């Protein structure tokens, strides 16, 4: 009976990833990565392990709906980076979607705003057409540096989604931009 009412967002995303050729599997519950990006008002639905990727795990978070608000989901992509401790803690950027008419209009453009500590991420991500297209279609994206038990970066998508091959390749591309950002900063100093 409990299985019938359980939220299957994690199972569905795992199935979608395998369908497009990404080798993914469900991790055991109470995985250490379930706490990454998890706030008091959210609960983790579990982690998906991804093989042969710069994003080795995905955590799915949910905020249950209330009387006046629907449930919400966040998809957290983990990007490990041992060099992250060298980068300033303020690194946190997110997409700003500009609409033709406030609230209801079509999305005309996507830019990145926030603090990238001179890494050049905002400029790199803002001019990439594939990343703009992904953000227009799937929602807001946010990149944060993590310095706790998990050392690296998180890419957070603020809703459920069913990835296509192009979506996954673009997410991998974002991860590669993030992982190469320190080299850009080092070149700039010279």
Question: Where does each model-flagged region fall?
Answer:
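Charge-rich, low-complexity N-terminal segments
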Residues: 1-91
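Charged, low-complexity intrinsically disordered regions
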Residues: 30-34, 40-42, 66-72, 80-190
């Amino acid at each position: 009976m409990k299985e019938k009412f359980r939220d299957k967002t994690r199972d569905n995303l795992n199935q979608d990833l395998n369908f497009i050729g990404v080798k993914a599997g469900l991790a055991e519950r109470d995985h250490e990565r379930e706490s990454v990006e998890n706030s008091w008002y959210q609960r983790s639905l579990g982690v998906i392990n991804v093989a042969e990727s710069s994003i080795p795990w995905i955590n799915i978070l949910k905020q249950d709906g209330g009387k006046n608000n629907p449930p919400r989901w966040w998809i957290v992509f983990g990007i490990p980076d041992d060099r992250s401790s060298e980068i300033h803690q303020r690194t946190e950027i997110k997409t700003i979607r500009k609409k033709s008419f406030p609230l209801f209009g079509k999305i005309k453009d996507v830019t990145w705003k926030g603090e990238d500590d001179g890494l050049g991420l905002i400029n790199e991500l803002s001019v990439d057409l594939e990343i703009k297209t992904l953000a227009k279609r799937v929602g807001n994206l946010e990149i944060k540096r993590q310095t706790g038990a998990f050392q690296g970066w998180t890419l957070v998508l603020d809703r459920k989604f069913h990835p296509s091959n192009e979506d996954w390749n673009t997410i991998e591309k974002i991860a590669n931009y993030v992982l190469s950002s320190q080299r850009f900063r080092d070149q700039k100093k010279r």
